[in-house]
Amino acid sequence: MPIRHCIVHLIDKKPDGTPAVLHARDSELAESAAIENMLADLNESYNAKQGKAWGLFHPESGAFPFSGWLKEYMEGGKDFTAFSKVAVEHLQKLMEESNLSVGGHVLFAHYQQGMTDYLAIALLHHSEGVAVTDQLDVTPSRHLDLGQLHLAARINVSEWQNNKQSKQYISFIKGKNGKKVSEYFRDFIGCQEGVDGPGETRTLLKAFSDFVESEDLPEDSAREKTKTLVDYASSQAKLGEPMGLEELSELIDEERPKAFYDHIRNKDYGLSPEIPADKRTLNQFRRFTGRAEGLSISFEAHLLGSKIEYDEEAGTLVIKGLPTSLTDQLKRRN
């Protein structure tokens, strides 16, 4: 993963309304193994983060100037340090307007994966820990907590530059339960949601369930294809990449690689050729689980409609083919 440019600035601010103080770095960070490891860990943590949203830039304006600065940098009008400085000054201003915001180290990293350029921006905080010295003494130790990302975004610069119709070249971490504490960061990037990741994933899973039903597949085959879909989606999510419907279709049925893709198009589910995988929705699709009043139920989703029947009006489940271990326990209950 070649790192083209990387820099860190510090915004010192507490959530008490006091002015934010910017400590800007004057030059890029030199290439080092530490920088490479930090960015690799950051990407791994970011890709694993649930609840991300995907979108695109607002039209450039005084309220949303970031895309204009990025364009100027990519076209050679600004060097990376100058670009990051004007951007972090804008972030400082937005932080001061948001009483809930706290400061931190602001990372800007321009890197490549394959032939694709990315820009990652993250607000990082320290954690207190301990370390053991060469003299075997235990000493306090501070480190960047890359595992707890709350404000971060990643821009697929190549997609932004080359595909004017794309609505998902930016991904960003959304605040939990609509918390406004993260809104200033989204405004800083100047992005708007363009793709409903959970909604698109639910539609894809509905299309897949319809496909399996229309094909009248045996249970083993349905289970295998379900695993293929979930494994592919999870793999793409781990890489931070969207799911390609044509590629997924080829994996689901190698003998008829276009079958699932044609099903999606013919039934007009309204899915984009590439959609972001929402991990929370995928996990719900893999299994149904529930617990209440001493009862715990968990079963694989593909069993619904075959071994397990759900009566919504009566609020009941009918389970066929109980596990032998369970029936043996029931027989011995007296």
From Swiss-Prot:
Pfam families: NA37
Keywords: Cytoplasm
Subcellular locations according to the entry: Cytoplasm, Nucleoid
GO MF annotation: an example: single-stranded RNA binding
Residue ranges of the TM segments: none
Gene Ontology CC: one annotated term: cytoplasm
Domain of life: Bacteria
Chief location of this protein within or outside the cell: cytoplasm
NCBIfam families, alphabetized: PRK00378.1
PANTHER family: NUCLEOID-ASSOCIATED PROTEIN YEJK, PTHR38772
Assigned protein family: Belongs to the YejK family.
Protein name from the UniProt record: Nucleoid-associated protein Pfl01_0983
Organism listed in the record: Pseudomonas fluorescens (strain Pf0-1)
